[in-house]
């Protein structure tokens, strides 16, 4: 039922149904706040130095929680890094992945009853490439030097 629901919200992209697993990656806009268990882990790792942890919490509150834009950027960037890690791990195990951003983000948010602090970032289809299927040829990619400057 969830796969069918996602299929429609992914604009009927066949890979949603064809892949054995499709993940919806959701970012937590409040993942930086005091409720994150990472602060307890940090306290242990710094030998119980509460002052150091409090300083890190204050920095996080400013850097990631001082505006709606910063909260959204925090959630999206961390979830994007997680997505890349998932795809790299999948590749290591011989599993193919296909990230998808052509989604009805608001529809997914409602259909899967996400909270106000959660934001849909992307979906990833995971499975095995069907060698009998013809794919579109890969389009040319721009070179690093064409899109980036080292400063």
PLM regions and their residue ranges:
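Acidic, surface-exposed loops and disordered segments
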Residues: 1-151
């Amino acid at each position: 039922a969830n796969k069918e629901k996602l299929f429609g919200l992914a604009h009927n992209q066949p890979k949603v149904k064809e892949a054995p697993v499709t993940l919806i990656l959701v970012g937590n806009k409040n993942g930086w706040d005091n409720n994150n268990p990472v602060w307890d882990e940090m306290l242990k790792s710094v030998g119980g130095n509460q002052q150091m942890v409090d300083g890190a919490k204050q920095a996080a509150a400013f850097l990631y929680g001082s505006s709606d834009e910063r909260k959204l950027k925090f959630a999206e960037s961390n979830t994007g890094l997680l997505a890349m890690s998932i795809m790299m791990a999948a590749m290591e195990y011989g599993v193919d992945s296909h990230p998808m951003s052509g989604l009805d983000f608001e529809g997914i948010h409602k259909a899967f009853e996400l909270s106000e602090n959660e934001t849909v970032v992307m979906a990833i289809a995971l499975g095995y490439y069907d060698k009998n299927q013809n794919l579109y040829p890969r389009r040319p990619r721009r070179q690093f030097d064409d899109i980036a400057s080292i400063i």
